[in-house]
């Protein structure tokens, strides 16, 4: 945690800012190990501090690696900063406007992406936790025995979450998607109280020690479904094969998108090719046409091309990769489940 703070202090010095204000829960957790349950103000400066809510004080004192004080009011917090001679304040881009308003009359303020840039590059410890979350999620999927499961979509989703927790997850990393039949053409379908139809699409993930995993598998049954599955698998595999440091994220999106377009389904690929993950399930950067972030070693990003045929079915295949000299898939669950 100290290295995260030291790096941000260097950014502050370079840009002539005296302090950096964070309120997003996972940003506070990233800096201090303490994840708020109510609200918190984390101020990174020479002597960093967290102002925590009264109901969180026991938790904050237990978990935080930096000093914690009980939040009294905006005025008290602002007065303490001014007494330290702080006249300007960098803020995270996600800072709520209502919070910004409280500070703008007392400090020169500018939005800075220091924390986002820090979180793009995962430490070996972070990657280990993502890998463990993936291991838990994939084992739970296999324990589910989906091809012999006669439950409803809702029951299957519930069972998968239960299995992940039994296998060591703290919880699911997002609302588990179990969808089937024609509804599988909805990228964010909600599980229904209906028996599984064909094909079956499951998008799921676990959280382990705060870090998320994310996978998608589609089980196909007909020749037509297999045809679409093969196209998506080709796009998935080629995108992963081409990932390397120095390329732009948008170039990887184009690799996957070009394959799907070449088969005539370009307009049926209706989302980006992937997103980073870590403490949050969606982080930056991502494999999208609009993201020109340069790929670097230490990034962890999903690859999830899909084809969605309205009224028929959809196919999506997703794995998470860690990037060093090339991309390595995290986990060992086969793409084809049979």
PLM regions and their residue ranges:
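Active-site neighborhoods and metal-handling regions in enzymes and metal-associated proteins
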Residues: 1-338
């Amino acid at each position: 945690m100290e290295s995260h703070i030291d790096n941000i202090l260097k950014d502050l010095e370079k840009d002539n800012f005296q302090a950096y204000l964070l309120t997003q829960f996972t940003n506070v957790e990233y800096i201090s190990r303490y994840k708020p349950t109510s609200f918190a103000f984390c101020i990174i400066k020479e002597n960093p501090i967290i102002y925590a809510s009264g109901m969180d004080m026991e938790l904050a004192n237990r978990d935080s690696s930096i000093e914690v004080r009980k939040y009294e009011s905006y005025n008290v917090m602002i007065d303490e900063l001014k007494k330290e001679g702080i006249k300007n304040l960098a803020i995270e881009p996600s800072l709520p406007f209502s919070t910004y308003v409280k500070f703008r009359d007392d400090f020169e303020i500018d939005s800075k992406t220091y924390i986002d840039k820090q979180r793009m590059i995962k430490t070996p410890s972070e990657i280990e936790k993502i890998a463990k979350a993936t291991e838990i999620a994939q084992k739970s999927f296999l324990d589910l025995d989906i091809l012999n499961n006669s439950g409803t979509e809702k029951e299957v989703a519930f069972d998968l979450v239960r299995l992940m927790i039994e296998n060591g997850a703290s919880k699911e990393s997002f609302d588990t998607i179990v969808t089937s039949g024609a509804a599988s053409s909805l990228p964010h379908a909600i599980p229904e109280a209906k028996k599984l139809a064909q094909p079956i699409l499951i998008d799921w993930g676990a959280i382990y020690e705060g870090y998320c995993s994310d996978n998608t598998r589609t089980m196909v049954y007909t020749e037509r479904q297999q045809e679409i599955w093969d196209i998506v698998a080709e796009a998935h595999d080629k995108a992963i094969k081409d990932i390397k440091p120095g390329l732009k994220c948008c170039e990887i999106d184009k690799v996957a998108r070009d394959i799907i377009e070449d088969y005539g389904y370009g307009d049926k690929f209706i989302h980006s090719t992937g997103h980073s993950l870590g403490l949050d399930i969606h982080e930056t950067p991502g494999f999208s046409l609009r993201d020109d972030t340069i790929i670097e070693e230490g990034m962890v990003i999903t690859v999830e091309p899909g084809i969605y045929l309205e009224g028929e079915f959809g196919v999506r295949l997703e794995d998470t990769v860690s990037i060093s000299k090339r991309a390595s898939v995290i986990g060992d669950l086969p793409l084809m489940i049979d």
